[in-house]
Amino acid sequence: MINTSPLLNYVSSHHDIKAINQWRTDVEKQLQDSYENGQSIREIIKARSDLVDEALVFLWKHAELDQSKLGLFAVGGYGRREMLPYSDVDIMILSEDEISEENEKRISTFISSLWDVGNFKPGISVRTIQSCVEQAATDLTVATTLIEARLITGNTQLAKWPRRIVSQTWTDKTFYDAKMAEQAKRYHQHNNTESNLEPDIKNAPGGIRDINQIGWIAKRHFRVNRIYDLVHLGFISEFELAVLEEAESFLWEIRHHLHRLAKRDENRLLFDHQREIAAKFGYVRQEGQPVNYGVEQFMKRYYRTAQQVSTLNEMLLAYFSESVITPRLPNYERKIEVVNDHFKIVDNKLAVQHHKIFAEHPSAILELFYILANRPDIEGIRARTLRLLILAAKRINQSYRDNPEHQALFMSIIRSPYRLYDTLVAMKRYGVLGNYIPAFGQIMGLMQYDLFHIYTVDAHTLLLLRNLNRFREPEFAKEFPVVSSVFQRLARQDIVFIAALFHDIAKGRGGDHSELGAEDAIEFGRAHGFTERECKLIAWLIQNHLLMSLTAQKKDISDPDVVKDFAEKLGDMEHLDYLYTLTVADINATNPKLWNTWRASLMRQLYTHARDVIRTGLGRPVDYQMLIEDTKFAASELLVNNFALADVEKVWQELGDEYFIKESADEIAWHTQAILKHGDNPEPLVLLRAHRKAAQDAVQIFIYTRDQPNLFATTVAVLDRMNLDVQDAKIITASTAFSLDTYVVLDRFGTLLTDPEREETVKNALVKALSQPDQYPGLMQRRIPRQLRHFDIENTVDVTLNEALQQNMVEISTLDHPGLLARVGGLFMMQGLDIHSARIATLGERAEDIFFVTKKDGKPLNHEEVKLFSEKLKAALDEASNQICQH
């Protein structure tokens, strides 16, 4: 029992309707105290609804409506007695006939008093029975509210009408079809997934609306008031009801906290609130745990809960369709195809032959999915079979996993060429995959608290497997031409599938997830028929699944030594081919924004160069002189018809060997032609063209200008202002004191090379700024994205010496923000450092950038200079991060 102050104590002493405002404030505090003292959220939200009833009855009488024949109904969540702190108070005033003028005045008084109270958010409709019929017939929302309309006060004869109206205007089938179409639209608005980074706990798949949906459809047909009543009708089991109620209470509690934190009706579990709400549920990081452990465990519970809700929603509504809707269709004839002794296909869905199949033949659990994987014509699983399957999955134990028949069935599913992804998603959803591979069960719902990994670990893993499967489908060969060709010639494609399944399986355990996952995979591989050699290859792929992407992202892959070092770590073409396919599939399954033709070109370039090194022999040293001569010859062939070789040589002799080692013949010819045409023009030269290997996304910007301080900082500031994201930069300073800079940028709008006016704007902005870089304002003030303010990223600076280049490599990891590159470039200038090249990577909210620098005399920093510079750069990054968090 929750003790709250009686309303009459307030209105009788104050003689003022507005006193209800103070009463609501006081009882809301009392409700919160009760909640904090252990009262269940169910009791709290019901008590709040009853208190609102009390206030409305008082106001109804105050407006003298108790003397009318009208009825006051609660609708929506209020009708279900589900009131959160800032929920709308949705009501309907219903009349049997046309409303008299006198009652209209009373209604007006009642509505005015509702607004006068001040802390109600009323949603009011006034209808006659006839208008209800007319609106319900054409408006699904109206029909839905009528199903749960609850008479608060007034004419009790009207209480039966709302549901009667729905029965008159909608059949079981039309209402079911309309609500399912509405749900599909709602799902689409939330990416058809339970695991969005900032989920809407009311409307997203697996949210409160999914539970409401079960109630609406069942109440419409069975004429019950509570989902609990459906147990006695055999529509839902006691166990399923308990799962739903526990999930509903958890979602209500989250929503309760969201309302109080946001001080409004808020359903989105934003980054702004996740950590604080996690703490309210007791998910707090303990000493020695990762910094985001608490919030990640809380979100894991949320995602698992949402998965349970959406699965029950799917099963129960399918059961309703199969048992109530379909059999009543005119001319309906059940179509049955016998598959074998265990299964049949009923109306295109798979069903067991009898309800004891899984108990008597445990292998049928996996056999069901084997059939699904190899029969694209089957549309799903019958609801009764699904109910049996979910219960049977809980009986999968070590003895089941050790059974050779079951192991063979599982591998047959993995090797299925048809519906691997859909089958594995179903196995996960219905509890089979997490029980068959317990380590996979541990990562289900596990999220990483950042903007880079937009999927939970389990969802990411299955998307990776989907991508691998696509590499053998002709329709994706155009999108992934090289990797598709490589994948199709792999001797054992199931090796890379198992590596994919286990590559992140040890996340969340602590320790090196790659090493732990490799150990799990070896144990699994031995049990499932792989040889020791194959197990070692699977383990190597898991241990090195980030090697290729990190090499392409953080190292200069135009440097032959970098490629040679990478190739030596692989050893042979087999390891290269397997790793390449795994890497491309992995990147595409991490974040859709991460993959573009620029990144694809980097992967392809690294693959082809490593392949060439392996084929010519890993032991052979790089012949730089021959490489330079070959590149010059190829470039001169492209120029010979338009320019005198003497003029070409004059340009080239100022550039140094590194330029000809790292640039392609095509790019050298492009640069040389532009410089010769530019002649003695004192203005900076700026050219744009599509990147030769990544034309769809990436643009190359070539700048030729007199070398002077602040060039890099000025250039990147202009590019940021023009909505261009720098991916790569190469800066060559010629002996003539001219700088040749090549930037690869991604266009946020995708119009740079198709809109001549915009292209000209970018060129002019660069020319103007580079003509007087010391006067350019530099940093641009742009709005900091809301999400960035909630990530606590430790800024790191690592400065090392590249012995071969005699340059310092500066690696920074920091919170990405507008103007970051310009800020860093400005600091380099102030410290008297020249930037020779840069690799820029934005991974969600994190920037991981690499710069190769020297002092003005071309020499690297010494030990003391490195220490001093590192401290200054770290301080600058810390200051920028603090400004973002306080923004």
Swiss-Prot record:
Region (Uridylyl-removing), start-end ranges: 339-699
SUPFAM superfamilies listed in its UniProt record: ACT-like (SSF55021), HD-domain/PDEase-like (SSF109604), Nucleotidyltransferase (SSF81301), Nucleotidyltransferase substrate binding subunit/domain (SSF81593)
Domain HD: 457-579
Swiss-Prot/TrEMBL keywords: Hydrolase, Magnesium, Multifunctional enzyme, Nucleotidyltransferase, Repeat, Transferase
PROSITE patterns: ACT (PS51671), HD (PS51831)
GO molecular-function term, one example from the UniProt record: [protein-PII] uridylyltransferase activity
Gene3D superfamilies: Hypothetical protein af1432 (1.10.3210.10), Nucleotidyltransferases domain 2 (1.20.120.330)
Transmembrane segments: none
Cited Pfam families: ACT, GlnD_UR_UTase, HD, NTP_transf_2
UniProt-listed GO biological process terms: regulation of nitrogen utilization
Presence of the UniProt keyword Nucleotide-binding in the record: no
Protein role: Modifies, by uridylylation and deuridylylation, the PII regulatory proteins (GlnB and homologs), in response to the nitrogen status of the cell that GlnD senses through the glutamine level. Under low glutamine levels, catalyzes the conversion of the PII proteins and UTP to PII-UMP and PPi, while under higher glutamine levels, GlnD hydrolyzes PII-UMP to PII and UMP (deuridylylation). Thus, controls uridylylation state and activity of the PII proteins, and plays an important role in the regulation of nitrogen assimilation and metabolism.
Family label: Belongs to the GlnD family.
Protein name, as recorded: Bifunctional uridylyltransferase/uridylyl-removing enzyme
Organism the protein comes from: Acinetobacter baumannii (strain ATCC 17978 / DSM 105126 / CIP 53.77 / LMG 1025 / NCDC KC755 / 5377)
This protein's encoding gene: glnD
